[in-house]
Amino acid sequence: MALRYPESDPVVRTVKHRLDSTDAAAHAAAPARTTTHPGAHPPLSAKDVRRLSMFAPALVRPAIVDSFRKLSPRAQAKNPVMFVVYIGSILTTLLWVMALRGQAEAPAGFILAVSVWLWFTVLFANVAEALAEGRSKQQAASLRGIKTTVQAKVLADPQRRDRVQPRAATALRRGDIVLIEAGDMVPGDGEVIEGVASVDESAITGESAPVIRESGGDFSSVTGGTRVLSDWIVARITANPGESFLDRMISMVEGAKRQKTPNELALTILLVSLTIILLLATVTLLPYSIFSVEVMKAAGVTSSPITITVLVALLVCLIPTTIGGLLSAIGVAGMSRMMQANVIATSGRAVEAAGDVDVLLLDKTGTITHGNRQASRFIPAPGVTVKALAEAAWLSSLADETPEGRSIVTLARQLGEAAVDEAALARSQPVFVPFSAQTRMSGINVALGDAAHQIRKGAADAIRTHVTVLAGRFPEAVLAAVEDVARKGGTPLVVSDNDRVMGVVELKDIVKAGIRERFAELRQMGIKTVMITGDNRLTAASIAAEAGVDDFIAEAAPETKLALIREQQAQGRLVAMTGDGTNDAPALAQADVAVAMNSGTQAAKEAGNMVDLDSSPTKLIQIVEIGKQMLMTRGSLTTFSIANDVAKYFAIIPAAFATTYPQLAALNVMRLATPASAVMSAVIFNALIIVFLIPLALKGVKYRPLGAAALLRRNLWIYGLGGLLLPFPGIKLIDMFLAAMGWV
């Protein structure tokens, strides 16, 4: 039976809203009310933070200050390799003080020069790490600026929106029901349980385009600190104070408790082992040198033992200080690059795992497709024009607030076929017929001109029964169109006007633009893509073919996804998955790399180890590239660091033992001016190379979609050979400069 909705009903308000041709986007353009902390310095926005250049003053100045703060023993002890340099700096400083007091083992100026450059080496490593952390700190500051003190409108009874109780947002608890109207800030994380609204999430995502949040489905999550631009929603708070998504984001990007990843730990163990071996070897050189001097003295040859200052310089130049000084910065920069991609990762482990992914599982709904069935075309019945069908479908959908109903209205307008006089329609006081499980139809009763119309849309069998009752007939051509749409994986809706069948509206899951090309890139990387959906095999096969995935699993239940992930992991594969629905949460929790969409449900975001603020599942390709880039950068700089130690051998070994074993002068292939200049040149080069490699460590080695073997060969040629050859001209140029200036 038809219902005349009361004026206060949201459906009628929405229809009037549409008939007045007022779009949500117009509300988005209106100025929004904001609440800020009194006297607070406005932080950089999320978009401004991502646009900061690597060496922007906003990052460099704090990094220099932080580099001095990191000179504490506790901070230095976190990096064993640089801690050795730190101890060496202190030791040479003490030796310089002793030299000033007449207890010199070497000229005071030489000891001071070595000490200063050792301190520079430590500071340069600190600057690299501080620069990597700087962007994260700026992001955290911008997120803190979002947190505002607002008054929430708490509903004691969700059915009575006119009775609200003001309460501070900080006092909201999980389970509270709040009303959020146009212009209001969302007081806390929640799930929309009623209504639909346009929401500005730019404060968090950096994207100015508003998004739609509605009850039901996978787009029901709202985040505290965002702003409702139009309409209203009722939301259930899902997080207690201090546990919100914004709070967790701040904690993540600050990285105060950043743990080293497995690969980083393994590399640290390798570097520490090399450092210990070289430390023991260097320590034994002093007694060996003293013994050699005594032996040569007995033979009538005058020589002097190696000094502690030179031994410290030798040790620092031989241990892998380059990668040791940049290792932490590489890890932090990987997290920072992920943040620049608008992805929040819970840990470096997740970023690193992204670089080793073998299998990618994709939930169809909202990931490969837009997530809602959308009207794609009108198929008129014999004797009916597309215009007549579009007008009937448009009228029947005016009060339909489902995504499908809205898409029908949109398609009719896009085609320019909905030419009904909207003013006359509003004056006619139409009666809207809501959808019900019993009738499986919805529509409108309206008088247009002198004729009364009962326009309905719904399932084919429901419309067939309705038309038959009105003494109409259901054309065979329409039945064939219904079967054809279903066979292709779409959903057919039949539209009727009184006793006449007007035609079919085809609803289908629309595959996202550009998704096929992105899957081709994944395939080139060696990553297998698998689409998982609860649809039947026919629908799944159609969408899989259109999207270009490698494989698909149809009629899958949530436990099917979980079982497939465990099966792939049991075969030694790393599995990545994107998802946005509550049904994705168990699989997201099991996956090695679990990227939840920010537009998705709260359960999905809590289960994942990454959150994509742009809610773009194709972002996973970029995430994989960032993960691979971090691994490649770490490996490349390790290769470079170890390789360039070879050149330092030829510079510092002959210089260190020049007075003990003059014969070692034959190894001075670079023809360095003096032993002192050789030592100083090696120490200075060792410090400066960290500075020159900071941009590479922060920006990362450029990733190319090549096989692992090809990438390894390429990087060995560039960074292995480059690390071997570069120190020779570098040390020689520094030596020539020192000699020309007369400083050695």
UniProtKB/Swiss-Prot annotation:
The chain crosses the membrane at residues 80-100, 108-128, 265-285, 310-330, 650-670, 678-698, 724-744. It is found in: Cell inner membrane. GO terms for molecular function: ATP binding; ATP hydrolysis activity; magnesium ion binding; P-type potassium transmembrane transporter activity. Part of the high-affinity ATP-driven potassium transport (or Kdp) system, which catalyzes the hydrolysis of ATP coupled with the electrogenic transport of potassium into the cytoplasm. This subunit is responsible for energy coupling to the transport system and for the release of the potassium ions to the cytoplasm. ATP binds at residues 400, 404, 435-442, 457. This is Potassium-transporting ATPase ATP-binding subunit. Its main location: membrane. It comes from Ralstonia nicotianae (strain ATCC BAA-1114 / GMI1000). The system is composed of three essential subunits: KdpA, KdpB and KdpC. It is a multi-pass membrane protein. Mg(2+) binds at residues 580, 584. It holds the Pfam family E1-E2_ATPase. One of its GO terms (cellular component) is plasma membrane. Belongs to the cation transport ATPase (P-type) (TC 3.A.3) family. Type IA subfamily. It catalyses: K(+)(out) + ATP + H2O = K(+)(in) + ADP + phosphate + H(+). The active site is at 363 (4-aspartylphosphate intermediate). It comes from the Bacteria. InterPro entries: ATPase_P-typ_cyto_dom_N (IPR023299), ATPase_P-typ_P_site (IPR018303), ATPase_P-typ_TM_dom_sf (IPR023298), ATPase_P-typ_transduc_dom_A_sf (IPR008250), HAD-like_sf (IPR036412), HAD_sf (IPR023214), P-type_ATPase_bsu_IA (IPR006391), P_typ_ATPase (IPR001757). Keywords: ATP-binding, Cell inner membrane, Cell membrane, Ion transport, Magnesium, Membrane, Metal-binding, Nucleotide-binding, Phosphoprotein, Potassium, Potassium transport, Translocase, Transmembrane, Transmembrane helix, Transport. The keyword Metal-binding applies. Its EC number is 7.2.2.6. The gene is kdpB. It is an enzyme of class 7 (translocase).
